[in-house]
Regions:
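N-terminal active-site segment of His-dependent metallophosphoesterases
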Residues: 1-55, 345-356, 360-368
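Conserved active-site and cofactor/substrate-binding residues in soluble primary-metabolism enzymes
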Residues: 16, 159, 208, 245, ...
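A generic secondary-structure signal
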Residues: 23-27, 31, 59, 253-260
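Glycine-rich phosphate-binding loop signature in dinucleotide/nucleotide-binding domains
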Residues: 28-32, 108-109, 134-136, 217, ...
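Conserved residues at the C-terminal ends of beta-strands
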Residues: 39, 175, 274
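Accessory, non-catalytic peripheral segments of nucleic-acid enzymes
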Residues: 217, 221-368
Length: 368
């Protein structure tokens, strides 16, 4: 999840991520939200500063009429209940390894109930079957884990969907996956990963935000809407520069793709160069960083190109490398991609071009 920020930029991003949580709470208050559900990974790091913890707890206490329900995740090494010198707000509620239940609303025709439990190795195999809810209530269930169709032995953070179907769940609120995703659980309910409020690294690209639920206690319906809310968006931006013969042609190819993409200047971008370039072409990631770096908040350039090899020409040679290429091409067990990699490695090794060989391996490691 690292993005290799300099110190000042890293601090600014940490502040922005904290601010997004504070803004979300303010938005919830303005929307007259009665309950905020946090399904884990609130801090998502081992060491949480006193400043951050105080800001989070202080923000929750600022809205006493809005109840906050916090279920710890696998990345919450220091949970909100470990407040240090700070006082736990009365409107902040927690869960244990057995099912906890809270009444969110009992003023209408149907009660709105919240159930939640923290998954562990000790309870993961039996927790799903021990959930009992009233079928006439509107039931929200909160868990933190990876969804699977069926229970998998030995894995604590497993949400076995087959064991939660047809149990009266209207909305299954999940944490653990940091991207928004949702599907039908059964004919009655849905399961939803709202994702995290902000993407922190380039493994968390795309739109981030939160889910806003509108519960109709008369009709027994839960309407949901995903609200994009992140201050910045992260993008993986691949550009095929196949056939380019020098850095100028690479620039032109990237510039054309960049103009079409219309990426906001407030966002973070990982530019990935792909394809086969002409022999001797250096795409020059450092130069591209200088040329495009001022177009966005943060830019990282990764060169995953390879030099084109005229396999047919080399295979026709009466030489050691020609014999090597013919041998690889005749291999019926290897895929075309594997053959390309073997041919490239062999040709560079036979030519004694160890620097280029190491560079090729480095690109492959980055690609993997």
């Amino acid at each position: 999840m690292k993005t290799h920020f300099d110190t000042a930029t890293a601090k600014q991003r940490r502040d922005e991520i904290l601010d997004t949580f504070l803004r979300m709470m303010e938005r919830a208050s303005k929307e007259q939200v009665r309950a905020v559900l946090i399904a884990g990974d609130l801090y998502d790091k081992r060491n949480v500063t006193k400043r951050v913890r105080s800001a989070v707890l202080g923000c929750i206490a600022k809205y006493p009429d809005m109840q906050v329900y916090y279920l710890k995740g696998n990345h919450d090494h220091a949970g909100a209940e470990e407040a240090g010198d700070a006082k736990i707000p009365e409107n902040l509620h927690f869960f244990g390894e057995d099912w906890s239940e809270y009444v969110l609303d009992d003023s209408g025709r149907r009660k709105v109930m919240l159930y939640g439990a923290e998954l562990s190795k000790e309870n993961s195999q039996k927790l799903h079957e021990s959930l009992y809810v009233a079928q006439d209530d509107i039931n929200i269930v909160m868990l933190h884990g990876q969804t699977t169709k069926y229970m998998q032995g030995g894995k604590a953070e497993t949400v076995a969907l087959d064991r939660l179907k047809n149990r009266g769940i209207d909305y299954l609120a999940l944490g653990h996956v940091h991207a928004h995703a949702e599907e039908a659980l059964d004919k009655r309910g849905v399961w939803v990963y709202p994702g995290c409020l902000e993407g922190r690294g380039f493994d968390e690209c795309g739109v981030h935000g939160f889910m806003l639920l509108d519960v109709d206690t008369e009709k027994g319906k839960v309407e949901r809407e995903f609200i994009p809310f992140a201050s910045r968006t992260l993008h993986e931006f691949p550009v095929d520069v196949s056939g380019c013969s020098d850095a100028n042609e690479v620039f032109d190819r990237v510039y054309s793709a960049w103009e079409k993409a219309a990426i906001p200047d407030s966002d973070l971008v990982k530019l990935i160069l792909t394809g086969e370039v002409s022999e001797g072409c250096d795409p020059d990631p450092g130069l591209l960083t200088q040329q495009f770096g001022d177009k966005v908040y943060f830019l990282k350039v990764r060169d995953k190109t390879s030099e084109a090899i005229d396999t047919d020409r080399i295979a026709g040679e009466k030489s050691v490398r020609g014999a090597y290429v013919r041998m690889i091409l005749a291999d019926k067990k290897s895929s075309e991609e594997e053959k390309k990699a073997l041919i490239r490695t062999g040709i560079l090794a036979l030519a004694g071009e160890w620097d280029r060989l190491e560079e090729s391996w480095e690109k492959q490691r980055e690609a993997d």
